[in-house]
Design a protein with these regions (language model features):
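Glycine-centered recognition micro-motifs in short, flexible terminal segments and loops
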Residues: 1-16
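Alpha-helical hydrophobic helix detector
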Residues: 13-25
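Long, compositionally biased, intrinsically disordered regions
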Residues: 23-330
Length: 330
């Protein structure tokens, strides 16, 4: 090849080189763009899964609490360690829930770290750790969530009366209320409580519902105690320093050291206003009636809150609870 040929070949090479380099750059950019798009898709999927778990945790936890409560209600046998048993069942259900993501190539893990009381007695606090991985992406989040005992598509029953009355005839469910028949009177009699007969055929609320009359003195400061009657008719519960928390109710404890709740246990109506102000019976607050430690069950004086034809509806309240609910002190 003569010099002219070499020059032409060299010129052609330098003409082709920029095009080749440009092609390499375009290929590299295309590859990076595809990788970026895939990373973005994976990132959105990972965050979406984490959000899904965070949203569904309270619903699954509420189902666990409901089922554990029904277990105690139906058997009358308390849980030995409610926090541990609820946590274990919660973990089992979350493991099952997380496994559905395996077919999508996503590793999902939710560890239930702790189940315990919340600052709000109408909630249960759950601490958990969520891990979601896909490819090289990994997302971790620690959560502290409150599971409501009152808000949701299904009620959560109070298990305590069914534990206390087991072996004394048993409490039964009558629509939205607990009917005691003779079981509560038998329970009180077995403990040597005076005037236990006042609770023959008594009733109390079945499901946990938070009372809207706050502050609680609003119960008693209306004409004819209308708010108190509405509270009783609706079966509301109230915050209480003395009443048992829900997790301890699952263990059959009438009182506990935690900030808890209380409700009224309603004596059967009488056919005459026979109760004079000097008569007494166990105070109609559940933690008083179900406090079987020492002298925890104390008496209250009757208060008539409603009458209709020949039926008279009364509560027995001690002065401490009268003051709490705005009812005249005896």
């Amino acid at each position: 090849m003569n010099n002219k040929g070499y020059v032409m070949s060299l010129a052609s090479f330098f003409l082709i080189l920029p095009a080749f380099l440009l092609l390499m750059v375009l290929v590299d950019l295309s590859t990076n763009e595809a990788q970026t798009q895939e990373a973005n898709l994976n990132s959105h999927e990972v965050l979406g899964v984490a959000t899904d778990l965070e949203t569904n945790l309270p619903f699954i936890g509420r189902e666990v609490i409901r089922d554990k409560s029904l277990e105690v209600v139906n058997s009358g046998i308390p849980l030995s360690n409610s926090r541990k048993e609820v946590k274990e069942e919660f973990q089992n259900r979350m493991d099952k829930y997380c496994s559905k993501y395996a077919d999508k190539g996503v590793f999902v893990e939710c560890i239930i770290l702790k189940v315990d009381n919340s600052y709000d007695p109408f909630c249960v606090e759950v601490k958990s750790k969520i891990t979601v991985e896909k490819g090289t992406l990994k997302h971790n989040v620690n959560l502290t969530q409150n599971i409501s005992l009152t808000n949701g598509s299904f009620p959560i029953y109070d298990p305590l009366p069914f534990v206390k009355c087991r072996g004394h005839g048993g409490a039964t469910i009558n629509e939205e209320r607990i009917s005691y028949g003779s079981s509560l009177a038998n329970y009180l009699q077995s403990r040597g409580i005076k005037n236990y007969e006042a609770y023959e055929n008594a009733t109390s609320p079945l499901s946990i519902k938070k009372c809207p009359y706050d502050p609680y003195i609003l119960h008693g400061n209306t004409n004819e105690l209308v708010n108190l009657k509405n509270c009783i008719d609706n079966g509301f519960y109230h915050e209480s320093n003395d009443g048992a928390c829900f997790l301890c109710r699952l263990e059959g404890k009438g009182i506990c050291s935690h900030y808890g709740m209380e409700t009224f246990i309603i004596p059967a109506p009488t056919i005459s206003p026979c109760m004079n102000n000097s008569s007494t019976a166990p105070s109609s607050v559940d933690h008083v009636i179900f406090n079987d430690t020492g002298h925890g069950t104390y008496s209250g004086h009757p208060i008539l809150y409603f009458s209709s034809e020949n039926h008279y509806f009364s509560l027995y309240l001690d002065n401490s609870h009268r003051q709490k609910y705005g009812v005249p002190i005896f």
